[in-house]
Amino acid sequence: MKQLLEFIPLILFFTVYKLYGVQQAAITLVIATVIQLIVLKVLYKKIEKSQWIMGIFVVFFGILTAYFNDLNFLKWKVTIINGLFAAVLLVSQFVFKKPIIQMLLGKELKLPTNVWNRLNLGWAGFFIICMLLNIVISYYFSDDVWATFKTFGFTGLSLIAAIATGVYLYPHLKNVENTNEQA
């Protein structure tokens, strides 16, 4: 349910963009994102930091996009967000010496340090790839291609990255379960 709720503003943006253009799509995205945050707060009693960050960026860049009737502002948002997420992951690992993914999920998952490090680097790499893809598609393809790729391409890539994470973690989770059963 939560993942579907997070996907709704994007689908609304894409639909309105195709039917009515950039300005109306940006306004729809901003309104849908604010409603989404309210619904998340009501249903789950909590809004994650990443959701707040995304919400603030969407509202800020969405308003700029609507005001100037220029899709480039939302294109920049995608690049900045992916770069920011990659930077946070890399700084957590190389400056603070503890992967942020471990800080977020360490209570639920007990994994060796090297697995956390690889997982953190894998997701940092994913965000860097998304950032670079967004730059290329933004500058070398039409706005329609960008909007379609933003809606469906990045969603597909995120799904693939999540599945790859599960496949990578599966053997390590079995090892942790076996260790717990022996104890």
Swiss-Prot record:
Disulphide bridges, residue numbers: none
Membrane topology of the entry: Multi-pass membrane protein
Coiled-coil annotated residue ranges, if any: none
Membership in a protein family: Belongs to the YciB family.
Biological function: Plays a role in cell envelope biogenesis, maintenance of cell envelope integrity and membrane homeostasis.
Descriptive protein name: Inner membrane-spanning protein YciB
InterPro entries hit by this protein: YciB
Subcellular localization: Cell inner membrane
